[in-house]
Amino acid sequence: MAGTMPWRWNGTTLRDARGTDIAWVRDGVLTIAGALSGDPTQPDTLFDVETSLDGATASPRFFLRASPRANRSAGSEAAKQCEVSQAGLTVTRLRATCGDAHYLLERSAIFGKQRRIVALAEDGSSEGAEVARLTPRGSGLEVSASNPSGHGLPDVDAVVLSYGCLLVDTTPRIVRG
């Protein structure tokens, strides 16, 4: 992860440790700042985001799909579709794919909402190494690399996966009776 860690989602804006906006969501579009790559001349990468929380779908199970906009993202060749979905009956364990990469996003405590992101084998079957931790903080979410050097989780994957967890773990829920 190239951005200065830890990152923090505050509402729909993700900022690095210096307070620089590195990603934001507006009207169903996730924008990842090109400067996150370390090159300030890089254009922003745009994703169309669809979730089960939008109300457009009738799915009782959580999912998030982030599809790169090929026509507006100059880096769209490198950007890949990302999907996050429930791995069981509850949102305790989420499975995710970003291109060919597979991840498990699991809560690290029974009653807590802190999560760890585990990079899985290519087929998604075996346990792998923890690459990041996500900790809810009020109405936001803190993202930190498990590896001090920050290697192991691409920045784009970290942004999309953490946004999915932000929706699940910090959004107020409407309980239907």
Annotate each PLM feature.
Residues M1-V29, A33-A35, S76-A79, T90-G177:
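Low-complexity or membrane-interfacial segments used for flexible interactions
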Residues V29-E77:
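Short, well-structured hydrophobic secondary-structure segments
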Residues C82:
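Short, aromatic/His-centered strand-loop micro-motif at the edge of beta-sheets
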Residues S85-Q86:
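Surface-exposed, interaction-prone regions used to assemble/regulate multi-protein complexes
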